[in-house]
């Protein structure tokens, strides 16, 4: 089942074009020709014998598919910046059970009806929408003022019906504001005007701010060119994204202007931040322009091109979206599957408060904490932080690793502190709930603590047991859990049976090159290693 993330039409792509409608449809042979010329991976031999478009596109990734003229019109509405469309007002992703609600748009019908993000629409007007797909999404769209009844499965397994009134939702995808010396850019998607909004917002307000908070939570992506333009306001001139095509040829997308600020960016992300959002966030990290806080992002490291009647003779109002490139952020790292790992893992209910605390200033009359993160200085006013956002302050100190560079400022001077000392100075316990009591003597203590702070590895009862052994199969299971990756494919190793409990994890890790066999086509799943060997 393909997993697609978009805002009722907003998807990450390299470019978008205008269209006219037509009843003529794309043939399987024509679609195969498009894919063979552009798709980033080699198509399997079986794809040549596909009997339908659905069968053909089943051999591609989650982001490559055909759009009818009507679906393409809806798609274009989502990537052109400030748009109006009649729908339920929700950002969605397809899952095998139906349609998952990633977020709801302000003033949209979903918000008014009380549809909660994270729930799954399993039926529309009483008809199952499993597996989720474009044909079901179309049922959520309609004329403004009409209603649609959806059956939703909540996180606890219970179900409920909601009647949602479709509304003409006007969505400005980027807003810029300044409060108390802190700039706040709220960006819901990267459309054609987003780069301009960022550039004008930073240029016009930079003299009034100490730091810039860029909120990309729930931002499913958009145009890569918009992400590069927005990032350039903070990074300045340079190659900010690299594309690699089916032939292994690479090309860089360069920003040629000057940076518009020397203030650090604090990027807010969550699991709904994808694609162009990850280009921006990964670029901020790669160029040393700031930090990322929140939770790990979605993990989409491929870019698409759009084919329509303007650039393909086979198409007449309809369109094909094709994954044509793998992309790499400034600094050379990929976000594919893994996502952007935040500098500070902060629970979402504390993320905004934590960002504002990190946007403090070097005070003269009260104690402050200076954090050096990714080459940038961040100041926390301790008395103000403890009074207004004690939970957020504790979340920041919990997210830091023992090697964090911290300075305590007071009475005109500064002195360096350890993380434990900083926690105590702020009124918290020297150790956090994530600290392990049995790793201090391990030569890999720093690596273990860093991964624990990022919520990538977990202990049990405050212990990590670094000398305990794990089988190679168990290592793959831990990696799969950390990366949220599993595979139904088989054939990588002769001793990894398709029905074994570890096969999905081992095959997924082998597919992305994180593990290899021991020779002779074998993996040796029951061979052991220590946990600290696993960390390295």
Where does each model-flagged region fall?
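PDZ/PDZ-like peptide-tail recognition elements
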Residues: 62-103, 163
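Feature responds to low-complexity, polar/acidic, surface-exposed segments characteristic
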Residues: 4-5, 409-445, 458-473, 480-505, ...
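PDZ/PDZ-like domain segments forming the peptide/carboxylate-binding groove
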Residues: 26, 83-131, 192
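PDZ domains, with a preference for the canonical peptide-binding region formed by the helix
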Residues: 120-151, 199, 226, 301-311, ...
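Interdomain regulatory linker/hinge segments that flank or connect interaction modules
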Residues: 27-80, 149-151, 155-156
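Sec-dependent N-terminal signal peptides of Gram-positive bacterial secreted proteins and lipoproteins
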Residues: 3-25
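C-terminal "post-core" interaction segments
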Residues: 177, 182-432
